[in-house]
Design a protein with these regions (language model features):
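Short, basic, low-complexity termini and linkers enriched in Ser/Thr/Gly/Pro
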Residues: 1-3, 8-10, 23, 53, ...
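Aromatic (phenylalanine/tyrosine) cluster motif
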Residues: 4-8, 15, 41, 47
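Periodic, rod-like helical contexts
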Residues: 13, 24-31
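N-terminal polybasic/positive-inside topogenic patches
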Residues: 17, 30-37
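Tubulin/FtsZ superfamily GTPase core signature
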Residues: 22, 36-408
């Protein structure tokens, strides 16, 4: 059996007689090789019943891509044997059954706007839905699935910035929301907190996902600009408190911190930046699982960091520095205003996604992870992945999500 993965070579000497263990290969190559071997040596009907079948979908897809890319006439390593078309077909069948189902639901006006951003960005491997009490606004949303909630409570006219009305509206359409979320393994609930519909419905939607459907539930929300007033901020903080109690992790992006990134933007443009940050956060988390890359993570990796992660914050960095673009991008992420006044040494976990052009090496991505590891609690759980986007040649982007850290 021979497998090619990212210029690494695995040949028979790497396997023992049972074909179950792999020595002398990278962690990623090890995982893929084990996966392919399992599907050869273990009855498929038995393997499909195991929990691992859910966790390793992205790695199956890697194996498919690898087996396709290898020319059947090539011989790399003495005694290597080509992956047959029969194995390709079996892998395809298993991959189809093992897809991790990821659903993103935008609540209220802000959450629905973020869904539009997700549609434009073409997030790979996620289903999108927008819910709102405002019928006119919902008409402007390009989501594949839209739910007008609270027809009786609001008659399609909005929640009037009253969270209790937003919650009642969601309860009115509970069955439809539940039906949309059914089958999800990961649910992102996104909203701009402070108004009526998003603030009132987000925690209700999250409770369905978490408690009824046992999905890994991640809130991704913004807090209002100071200029939006005291009442809106009070509503937002009350809504955040309810949301964090039902989500595994709640990623919070304070809008005022965005102004430190783009201080000269008018407030309407700043709202669009907030939508963009929300979208990029969910895109990064989704595609680190679903999109083939140099180093992918699977469902269990994400669950390790996000399960009971509490309040979390995001940092974003980018650099094309010729001297040391990795260090520059990571330091920008670590010092991002979006992380706020948190103590990284208290962090329970961190997830790092590194994206670069075709010139990026695994060594660079690994160094990014090492810099973050040295900056946080030594007992924090750190996971990282990296992928290639050819248009980023010369540039490296870093998405950092820190869980469990407390404000200073």
């Amino acid at each position: 059996l021979k497998i090619f993965l990212f210029n690494f070579e695995i040949v028979p000497k790497n396997f023992d007689k049972a074909g179950q263990r792999i020595r002398g290969a990278t962690r990623v190559a090890q995982t893929v090789a084990k996966l392919v071997l399992r599907n050869i040596y273990i009855p498929v009907a038995t393997y499909r019943k195991t929990r691992d079948a859910l966790m390793v979908n992205s790695l199956v897809k890697h194996a498919l891509a690898v087996s396709k890319s290898v020319n059947g006439d090539q011989q790399i390593g003495q005694g290597a044997v080509d992956v047959s078309s029969d194995i390709d077909e079996e892998l395809r069948k298993i991959a189809a059954q093992m897809d991790v189902c990821i659903k993103i639901i935008g609540c209220g006006g802000g959450g629905s706007n973020t869904i539009n951003r997700c549609v434009d960005a073409g997030i790979s491997g996620a289903q999108l839905c927008a819910i709102n009490t405002d019928a006119k606004h919902l008409l402007t949303i390009r989501a594949p699935k839209k739910i007008l909630i609270g027809r009786t409570a609001t008659r399609g006219l909005g929640a009037g910035a009253i969270p209790e009305v937003g919650e009642q509206a969601a309860k009115e359409n509970e069955l439809e929301i539940r039906e949309y979320l059914r089958g999800a393994h990961i649910v992102f609930v996104t909203a701009g907190l402070g108004g009526g519909t998003g603030t009132g419905s987000a925690h209700f939607v999250a409770r369905i996902a978490k408690e009824s459907l046992q999905a890994l539930t991640i809130g991704v929300v913004t807090l209002p600009f100071k200029a939006e007033g005291t009442i809106r901020m009070e509503n937002a903080l009350a809504g955040l408190d309810k949301l964090r109690r039902v989500c595994d992790t709640t990623i919070v992006i304070p809008n005022d911190k965005l102004l430190e990134l783009v201080p000269k933007l008018p407030i309407d443009a700043a709202f669009k930046v907030a939508d963009e940050v929300l979208m990029q956060t969910m895109k990064g988390l989704t595609e680190i699982i679903t999109k083939p890359g140099l180093v992918n993570l699977d469902y269990s990796d994400i669950q390790t960091v996000m399960r009971e992660g509490g309040i979390s914050f995001v940092g974003i960095g980018e650099s094309d520095d010729e001297d040391d673009r990795v260090e520059a991008a990571v330091k920008e992420a670590l010092t991002s205003p979006l992380l706020g006044e948190i103590d990284l040494k208290d962090a329970k976990g961190a997830l790092i996604r590194v994206v670069g052009g075709s010139d990026m090496t695994i060594a660079e991505a690994q160094r990014a992870a090492e810099i973050v590891t040295n900056s946080v609690n030594e007992r924090a759980r750190i996971i990282w992945g990296c992928s290639i986007e050819p248009e980023l040649k010369g540039t490296i982007k870093v998405l950092l999500i820190v869980t469990g850290a407390k404000s200073k």
